[in-house]
């Protein structure tokens, strides 16, 4: 039956394609006749000039149309397709475009008689300007995918019904096309003969365009798919073999699966055509609104036509013949019915009947296909009823003998059966009828229950690279049965978003409450940037609030810093530190070392051999040899030093290299592997134990990193006057210096913090927030937060010299998470230097850490830390979810200074701003007033200082 259906469909496709080609040839013949008639006639000069204007307008519109068309073909189709003959494919597309728009334009010559050449050109220009190219390319993409699958059976659905039943996306385009048709129809009733002539031709071109897009184009593409299938059959052996993989596909180098490695295709942007996820309620409202406009235009068209008809009767008939339609109804002749129908068609305009019928059919289809929300993330996937046969038989008291026989069967031979039922209840495990059905089925191995899918057939489809054709239910069954792994979903379905949805569905079956997964967001995210780069087994993403810090005045430039955090008061406190630094003249920063390290561990049979290896590495010849092998792996890597540290017969070799704008871990690892292969040529008895021997040291606190440095080593310094300290931070330099000594030095030493890890207040807060916002490796927070905070008193004017030293800040501006759109936007927000963006980023991070350290130390000194947290973190939330009663950041710097201030200070006098010769930006002088500062000896306030 299926073969007969395919034959009939193929016959229809050939017939429709041939009909359109014959029609095109006939129209070209008619056009040639018109052109010859035009050239043979005696044309006056004004007529030729009039025709020339139309020709110029048409040429301008045509050139614009060709430009848009070329961009769309290159961007929408040729970039995403996996077919190899792209030049021939490009020629085919342009041929189809020429055929389509030539047939649409020339149709006005046949269906609209007595059309002048100028009106023909102008109507064609209007049609080209208003033509919907999107639906044309969507149909091409839809059937191009079928061609890539080289399977004609999957393209057997017919034209208009195919698009309506397969995807709701086409409904939008069809409604838009019918709306344009109705607008052209209204223009034919404008009572201006010239405009009516133009839009009559345009209306006919639009109707022919609809017929081509939804009848001819699918038929032609299905014939093309059939041809591709035959070509595929001839080359099938070449494509199936492991050596015959085309350039557009690639094999996995190492597959985690126990089966053979399947072909992994490049990503295609076909998610808009297959598995299109929309908001049903929103689209239904848009469709309803569009259809109301469409019907209104039809009614307006009928009214205009009827009014024109009535006015003509008034001029040509007597008063008794004003309504000839009613006269024909009252007549007793049989022919009066035909006159009545003729008059109605004359009033309606027969061209309108075609798209009126299609519009009513489309509206009926929309009403019948109104989307219904499912219970789990708007996915209309039937529930899978799963029963394990062994458990079912063991619980059944009816078949004890069969249960005993089943226990003798090896576990590898037992299969799980998945049944699809119309109801929503799971199968009762104690139902003896289902067990009896299974036992009867097992007696005849050739018979298979109708409700059990052939898992072997589905697995074979995946091996052939046709996994994206499977339904969601079939893929979920393969996952549950162990035939498919969730990590392979992106390669199988070739749609990252659909893979995430399927993985969430599979995970929900293992949860006690499957609706928990609904609270993890996953929509509105480009997973193409994640797959194969940032994360595996993706089930969604985790949104984190991002706060704005700034302006931070760093080396004469102001920066606004994005900070991703869930800790209250952190952004507000850092803003206060930024304000103090801004008023003090800014921060000076410098990068004094830049190197990424990797330290493999090797083994030698004797300590003599290990010492010889160390001597060779320390020699100039050895270093240059290793450097040559190291640097050739990448154009951005540059080996700086090699440090060999022995431990008995083991040697830890620490390679240090510059890596450009990347953080460089993968780059250095690859280069180190190449250097080890080179080293083994000189020491054949060397054995590589591990590419990383923990002397790097990566993602662990280590003193070697603070001494020798890893990543970017940065120092940032600011000089704050006593007035700025008193006004903004409400303290003085002596108190901050004493607090730093007792907290950061003595307290960290008593706690046993290694190296610089404890010599700061909360540097990790800023490091973690900025790493999350800018797409850095979050695990690098461990060693990147090594920070030495120094607050010293300048005895000359009681000012404060604040500095932070960060020897191992491991950051990058390319690769990894910096590819993600949100993280890339945060990097762009920082306005990094074009020449050395990564060094600039490290200096900004160090400056932000300094601002945060100053504010927290001042808050601890003035005992405002708890008050601020109670004020902001324990604030009562407003009942309105769209409003917030408290804000952690403000745009006004004057409000930032009041975060820890419970006093209303009036600004009256001025203070000087600390002079900084390296800072070019000028800071306006501010008014100050005395402010009480807490005394060291008592709780009473000291004598008032002049503060800002």
Curated annotation (Swiss-Prot):
Residues 364-466 are annotated as: Linker. PROSITE patterns: HMG_COA_REDUCTASE_1, HMG_COA_REDUCTASE_2, HMG_COA_REDUCTASE_3, HMG_COA_REDUCTASE_4. GO terms for biological process: cholesterol biosynthetic process; coenzyme A metabolic process; isoprenoid biosynthetic process. The active site is at residues 567, 699, 777, 869. The keyword Calcium does not apply. Pathway: Metabolic intermediate biosynthesis; (R)-mevalonate biosynthesis; (R)-mevalonate from acetyl-CoA: step 3/3. Keywords: Cholesterol biosynthesis, Cholesterol metabolism, Endoplasmic reticulum, Glycoprotein, Lipid biosynthesis, Lipid metabolism, Membrane, NADP, Oxidoreductase, Peroxisome, Steroid biosynthesis, Steroid metabolism, Sterol biosynthesis, Sterol metabolism, Transmembrane, Transmembrane helix. It catalyses: (R)-mevalonate + 2 NADP(+) + CoA = (3S)-3-hydroxy-3-methylglutaryl-CoA + 2 NADPH + 2 H(+). The keyword Flavoprotein does not apply. Its EC number is 1.1.1.34. It is found in: Endoplasmic reticulum membrane; Peroxisome membrane. GO terms for molecular function: hydroxymethylglutaryl-CoA reductase (NADPH) activity. It is a multi-pass membrane protein. Pfam families: HMG-CoA_red. Its main location: endoplasmic reticulum. Glycans are attached at residues 316, 430, 895. Residues 467-948 are annotated as: Catalytic. The chain crosses the membrane at residues 9-25, 55-71, 96-112, 124-140, 207-223, 286-302, 347-363. GO terms for cellular component: endoplasmic reticulum membrane; peroxisomal membrane. It is an enzyme of class 1 (oxidoreductase). Belongs to the HMG-CoA reductase family. PANTHER family: 3-HYDROXY-3-METHYLGLUTARYL-COENZYME A REDUCTASE (PTHR10572:SF24). This transmembrane glycoprotein is involved in the control of cholesterol and nonsterol isoprenoid compounds biosynthesis. It is the rate-limiting enzyme of sterol biosynthesis. This is 3-hydroxy-3-methylglutaryl-coenzyme A reductase. It comes from Schistosoma mansoni (Blood fluke). The lineage of its organism: Eukaryota, Metazoa, Spiralia, Lophotrochozoa, Platyhelminthes.
